[in-house]
Regions:
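Active-site cores that bind ATP or allylic diphosphates and position pyrophosphate for catalysis
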Residues: 18-176
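A glycine-rich helix N-cap at a beta->alpha junction
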Residues: 9-20
Length: 176
């Protein structure tokens, strides 16, 4: 629980461990379980990491997704060879164009999770304030260690497994 300890030492009021049944689910179910727990304990804000966007951006993406909700299941049936995110992206491009908030929200895992949080939050009885925290440094899946930027988890795991870039790895781990 070292991450929980660091969070508490740096001003977090409480740290809630997600049940395994929630944390091992697909994005939409993970988001649903997370939002339900946070709303039940009375949280008024939902903060999460993302590549870009603010609360208004995610609200717009949710609105666009709601506008095509009825078409999603039909489109998914017709395009079974694609992942759900790819299917939803194609449908969003068709309906709103490539520059829409929904299309942008589907471009990376963190954006997809942020969208899923926002969708579930909007369904709740007492929606929380959405507080996206923009990622600083390397992208979510970047696998190279870089002295000039915070490393991604992917890069740290790769370096630890391969015992490479020890100096840079030590510098990156000093942030943790």
């Amino acid at each position: 629980w070292s991450r929980a300890k660091v969070a508490l030492q740096n001003g977090a009021d409480v740290v809630i461990e997600m049940p395994t049944a929630v944390s091992c689910q697909a994005t939409d179910l993970f988001a649903r379980g997370t939002v339900e727990i946070l709303q039940k304990v009375g949280c008024d804000s939902l903060a999460f990491g993302c590549e870009s966007g603010d609360g208004i951006f995610f609200e717009e993406a949710v609105s666009q997704r709601e506008a095509i909700e009825k078409e999603i299941s039909r489109f998914v049936e017709e395009n079974r060879s694609l992942t759900f995110a790819s299917q939803l992206t194609q449908l969003a491009v068709k309906e709103f164009g490539e520059d829409s908030a929904l299309v942008e929200a589907l471009q990376s895992p963190n954006q997809q999770l942020g969208l899923a949080y926002a969708v579930e939050n909007a369904k709740g009885e007492h929606p929380m304030k959405i507080v996206p925290i923009t990622r600083v440094g390397s992208g979510h899946l970047d696998d190279a260690l870089d002295k000039t930027a915070f490393a991604s988890g992917t890069a740290l795991r790769k370096a630890l497994k391969g015992n490479r870039d020890e100096e840079v790895l030590r510098e990156q781990l000093s942030y943790v």
